[in-house]
């Protein structure tokens, strides 16, 4: 059977059970449970430092109303980073390369920010559809454009899918070219493959941060 490069992004099944469900539960198993002790091991200390720094950066531009989302956004950030990093291991499946998963996260959270804005401050939320000082003849056109841009915002899930898929495809292509080459050339290609892997690690972390950062910016407009 001939396999294509995109077969690695298909969700595998075992006994009729989609393994994407198993993969989604793995990050919560890997993270250690924080304890009430003053002194912990290095992993828990590093985890607490990272969560503290990220929460400070995330809540800095938000008012008190947006601070209620701190636990949700921080958990989402850790969840996405863990899934992205685990997907870089050999013979593993990356759930965040599935558009259904990313849009399933992006659309409800974006819709929640819009509903909060319409409920708490409907005038300000609707005011975002029309920039201040717009000439009267351009008002209908700008309202249509701003409405379209509002409904395009859940495309942040597409960004996450596209970046991770492109990175995995690049590594798979480089590895496929590496196999039939002579040892001398293969050494150079191995260096390129190693650099691509480092780049993909950075992309996996950055894309998770950008996903949550954009959600916090959408929240900032509506609280």
Swiss-Prot record:
Component of the ATP synthase complex composed at least of ATP5F1A/subunit alpha, ATP5F1B/subunit beta, ATP5MC1/subunit c (homooctomer), MT-ATP6/subunit a, MT-ATP8/subunit 8, ATP5ME/subunit e, ATP5MF/subunit f, ATP5MG/subunit g, ATP5MK/subunit k, ATP5MJ/subunit j, ATP5F1C/subunit gamma, ATP5F1D/subunit delta, ATP5F1E/subunit epsilon, ATP5PF/subunit F6, ATP5PB/subunit b, ATP5PD/subunit d, ATP5PO/subunit OSCP. One of its GO terms (biological process) is proton motive force-driven ATP synthesis. CDD domains: ATP-synt_Fo_a_6 (cd00310). It is found in: Mitochondrion inner membrane. It catalyses: H(+)(in) = H(+)(out). The chain crosses the membrane at residues 12-32, 69-89, 98-118, 132-152, 165-185, 197-219. It comes from Oncorhynchus mykiss. Belongs to the ATPase A chain family. Keywords: ATP synthesis, CF(0), Hydrogen ion transport, Ion transport, Membrane, Mitochondrion, Mitochondrion inner membrane, Transmembrane, Transmembrane helix, Transport. This is ATP synthase F(0) complex subunit a. It comes from the Eukaryota. GO terms for cellular component: mitochondrial inner membrane; proton-transporting ATP synthase complex. The lineage of its organism: Eukaryota, Metazoa, Chordata, Craniata, Vertebrata.
